């Protein structure tokens, strides 16, 4: 049995190792996480074969569920992208006279972000911000920051996004509940971190026109886009199916055949599978796409997820090493003796790791590995709440090490200092508000 000092030192050094290898030596996060896994296993006295077996089971156990859901989610997002469904939502919201332009961008980011990776969402939806900025003579910062803050929020707290799904799965949280809580917290955090924060700045927010190099980017002709009803039905269908499963678990007898049916169709794999074929028809065939064209789009989408699958698999390996060694159990005792609330701890660890490793996904996986061992000591706090707390922490600290920071800077034509002052601050405020919302939820449920 290793001393607590040895355990803490091993964990801290492993985190430093991950940060250094990614930031300093430019290792891929997959390699960095595997290296840290071998390091922890060695320091905790695991045998070589035990380490390899733990890593294999960690990768396989994690991707066995997540690979299918992420793959299906990628198809859904790709169909949203190529059909123009995301633009349809934005154009429809523009007609709501009672909504300000910045609030519209938050809603666009939250709704469309459910099925889009955050960077893809920025690239796909920023032309809408350009269009509104030109029409209303509004600073681009006032539109782009709420959009990107909302996309980041939904990316971190709402399954079926890969990191949020990983956290929910590893903590044993109900995915339907996490979706509902995540949307509530994400909406509140995005509105306060985006529009309200920028309203507070007032005239101190500089006017930024659409950069000349992006002046040609335009929203597609509205006549070519799918209808709003078809778009919303496709986006919300998998979420509705997963929520039906959650409701059934709370209110139905588990022996009934109808309960089994709802459990089946509400499983994330089944729900996403059904949604993909609905998307093929509603956003593809009805938009005059051939099956050959949709196959090409599907294959192109799959090419983009190899990176995230490898990172998530390595995160599962790191988690498995912590559990297989005695580190996880000892860490649970140490953390409980710190007398820090587990929600605050989960948020803080994710926040710090995001700033350090430049990836919200890696930060959330690392935070899960650190926080998960102590959950049995707090039976009154649901795993769904801890999942939201981890995601809330990962929203913040979008700084120069994060690719999203540079996307915002480039598209807004902002200086480095301006991007720090307005976008980094917006994500940090959103993160703090999300933490407050998580605490509030913990008192209610």
Residue ranges and their predicted role:
Residues 48-135, 288-375:
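Membrane-embedded alpha-helical segments and adjacent helix-loop junctions characteristic
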């Amino acid at each position: 049995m290793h001393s607590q000092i040895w355990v803490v030192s091993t964990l801290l050094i492993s985190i430093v190792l991950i940060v250094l290898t990614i930031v300093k030596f430019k290792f891929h996060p997959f390699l960095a996480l595997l290296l840290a896994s071998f390091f922890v296993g060695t320091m905790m006295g695991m045998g070589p074969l035990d380490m390899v077996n733990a890593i294999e089971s960690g990768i396989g156990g994690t991707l066995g569920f997540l690979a299918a859901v992420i793959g299906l989610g990628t198809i859904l997002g790709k169909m949203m992208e190529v059909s123009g469904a995301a633009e349809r939502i934005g154009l429809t919201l523009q007609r709501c006279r009672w909504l300000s332009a910045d609030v519209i961008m938050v809603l666009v980011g939250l709704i469309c972000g459910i099925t889009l990776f955050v960077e893809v969402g920025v690239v796909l939806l920023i032309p809408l911000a350009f269009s509104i900025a030109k029409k209303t003579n509004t600073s681009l910062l006032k539109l782009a920051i709420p959009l990107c803050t909302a996309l980041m929020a939904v990316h971190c707290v709402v399954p079926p996004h890969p990191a949020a799904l990983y956290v929910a799965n590893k903590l044993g949280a109900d995915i339907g509940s996490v979706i509902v809580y995540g949307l509530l917290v994400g909406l509140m955090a995005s509105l306060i971190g985006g529009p309200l924060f920028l309203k507070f700045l007032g005239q101190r927010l500089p006017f930024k026109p659409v950069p000349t190099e992006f002046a040609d980017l335009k929203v597609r002709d509205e006549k070519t886009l799918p209808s709003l009803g078809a778009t919303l039905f496709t986006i919300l269908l998998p979420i509705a199916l997963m929520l039906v499963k959650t409701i059934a678990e709370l209110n139905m007898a588990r022996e009934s055949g109808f309960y089994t049916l709802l459990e089946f169709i509400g499983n994330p794999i089944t729900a996403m599978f059904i949604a993909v074929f609905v998307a093929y028809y509603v956003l593809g065939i009805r938009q005059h796409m051939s099956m050959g064209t949709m196959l090409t789009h599907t294959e192109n989408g799959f090419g983009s997820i190899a990176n995230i699958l490898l990172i998530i698999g390595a995160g599962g390996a790191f988690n498995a090493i912590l559990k297989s060694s005695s580190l996880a159990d000892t860490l649970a005792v140490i953390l409980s003796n710190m007398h820090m609330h587990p929600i605050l701890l989960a948020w803080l660890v994710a926040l710090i790791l995001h700033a350090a490793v430049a990836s919200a996904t890696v930060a959330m996986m690392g935070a899960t590995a650190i926080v998960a061992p102590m959950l049995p000591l707090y039976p009154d706090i649901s795993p769904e709440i801890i999942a939201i707390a981890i995601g809330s922490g990962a929203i913040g600290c979008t700084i120069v090490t994060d690719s999203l920071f540079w996307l915002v800077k480039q598209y807004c034509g902002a200086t480095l200092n301006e991007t720090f002052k307005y976008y980094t601050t917006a994500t940090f405020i959103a993160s703090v508000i999300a933490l407050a919302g998580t605490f509030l939820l913990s008192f209610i449920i």
